[in-house]
């Protein structure tokens, strides 16, 4: 088990760290709620059920894939619901998570966070139009904010085959740009993501860029820097990929200014 000093050193060196921080009982509660929402969607919309509604894995995989094929809005409604549930909010604000994030941001224990980009990704195999290309969220989130990002698999260990997050090794130490960097910076603080297949690096200095998929087990999270280049993994199997994301902003930082990225009233 790494000491706090070693955790900080590794985070600064690599730009990310994988830690065991999630209570798996929380994940099971969310999985059960997800299955409930899926089965209710079938009933409420009079859709023929071809999966086993009494089996969680069948429901969240075959059941969700079929819902998406009937109408993407049915998946979208569930996508919008779960991250605002008390179970999910309890998960992203757990003491185990926030204490480590405070450690990495050099904050006091009583510091508070503003969270955004809180979601549970629900990626369907064979569909890539919702996958993000190479980007850093320093260019796309709150201007000048001091924040750390979280990515974690929900119900299956994350591997290259099932869409684990992909990074450019040591990119937090390189001043890299893509063909979309200027556009991202001009739209800073707004919803602004680039298509997976259209983003290319403009490698002016000729650095050798090496990408890596980060394997993550259930119960683990990736915490990474806002200037680490990353992109969505591609699913190469028949199951859904479910992953949680959240950004943790230090609201005590003088440069923090709230920006309404989502146009909520």
What are these regions (language model features)?
Residues 23-26, 120, 125, 139, ...:
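Short, solvent-exposed loop/turn segments at secondary-structure junctions
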Residues 16, 145-151, 162, 211-213, ...:
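Extracellular structured ligand-interaction cores
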Residues 1-13, 20-134, 140:
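Non-heme Fe(II)-dependent double-stranded beta-helix
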Residues 141-160, 215-218, 247-251:
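Short, conserved beta-strand element in jelly-roll/cupin
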Residues 134-138, 151-152, 208-210, 228-230:
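Glycine-rich, charged/polar anion/phosphate-binding loops
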Residues 160-229:
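Double-stranded beta-helix
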Residues 40-52, 60, 64-69, 176-183, ...:
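Non-heme Fe(II)/2-oxoglutarate
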Residues 119, 134-136, 152-156, 169:
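Short, structured patches in soluble enzyme cores that scaffold and shape functional sites
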């Amino acid at each position: 088990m790494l000491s706090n000093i070693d955790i900080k050193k590794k985070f600064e060196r690599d730009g990310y760290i994988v830690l065991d921080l999630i209570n798996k009982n929380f994940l099971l509660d969310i999985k059960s709620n997800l299955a409930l929402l899926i089965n209710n969607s079938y009933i409420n919309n009079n859709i023929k059920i071809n999966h086993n509604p009494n089996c969680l894995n069948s429901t969240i995989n075959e059941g969700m894939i079929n819902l998406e094929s009937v109408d993407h809005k049915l998946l979208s409604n569930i996508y919008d619901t779960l991250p605002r549930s008390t179970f999910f909010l309890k998960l992203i604000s757990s003491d185990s998570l926030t204490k480590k994030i405070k450690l990495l941001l050099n904050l006091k224990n009583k510091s508070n966070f503003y969270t955004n980009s809180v979601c549970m990704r629900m990626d369907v195999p064979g569909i890539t139009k919702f996958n993000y290309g190479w980007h850093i969220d320093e260019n796309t989130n709150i201007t000048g904010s001091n924040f750390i990002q979280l990515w974690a698999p929900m119900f299956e260990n994350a591997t290259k085959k099932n869409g684990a997050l992909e990074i450019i090794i040591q990119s937090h130490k390189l001043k890299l740009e893509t063909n979309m960097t200027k556009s991202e910076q001009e739209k800073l603080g707004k919803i602004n993501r680039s298509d997976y297949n259209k983003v290319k690096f403009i490698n002016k200095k000729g650095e050798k860029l090496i990408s890596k998929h980060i394997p993550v087990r259930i119960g683990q999270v990736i915490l990474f820097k806002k200037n680490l280049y990353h992109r969505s993994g591609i699913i190469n199997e028949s199951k859904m990929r479910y992953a949680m994301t959240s950004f943790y902003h230090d609201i005590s930082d003088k440069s923090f200014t709230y920006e309404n990225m989502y146009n909520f009233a």
